[in-house]
Amino acid sequence: MLTEITFFERFEHDILMGKKTITLRNEAESHVIPGQILPVSTFETHRWFCDIQVLEVTPITLSGLTTLHAQQENMTLAELRLVIAEIYPDLEQLYMIRFKVLTK
């Protein structure tokens, strides 16, 4: 089970402002449960910037992503698919982790 989660620094503002409310992860990074509280750090420097509470974990495929998922990521669907392809090349099976920010 994950005990912390990291995000690229470019997503920090959107997370803190409540504009990014989900994250899409591979199977290895999907081991969280609803209700779990995780410290959040930047991927680049591991600087803590908030805590989140996991609300939901749902399997989803790359081809199953919708505009709603993109809105929850504060992106267009095209941008979301591009970002996922950069982070997880050639991966179809993803896991959507919906969360809320607890502390800033």
Swiss-Prot record:
Keywords: Hydrolase. Its EC number is 3.5.1.135. It is an enzyme of class 3 (hydrolase). Disulfide bonds: none annotated. InterPro entries: AC4CH (IPR008314), ASCH_domain (IPR007374), PUA-like_sf (IPR015947). The keyword ATP-binding does not apply. Residues 6-101 form the ASCH domain. Transmembrane segments: none annotated. The active site is at residues 20, 23, 73. It catalyses: N(4)-acetylcytidine + H2O = cytidine + acetate + H(+); N(4)-acetyl-2'-deoxycytidine + H2O = 2'-deoxycytidine + acetate + H(+); N(4)-acetylcytosine + H2O = cytosine + acetate + H(+). GO terms for cellular component: cytosol. GO terms for molecular function: hydrolase activity, acting on carbon-nitrogen (but not peptide) bonds, in linear amidines; N4-acetylcytidine amidohydrolase activity. It comes from the Bacteria. Belongs to the N(4)-acetylcytidine amidohydrolase family. Catalyzes the hydrolysis of N(4)-acetylcytidine (ac4C). This is N(4)-acetylcytidine amidohydrolase. It comes from Shewanella oneidensis (strain ATCC 700550 / JCM 31522 / CIP 106686 / LMG 19005 / NCIMB 14063 / MR-1).
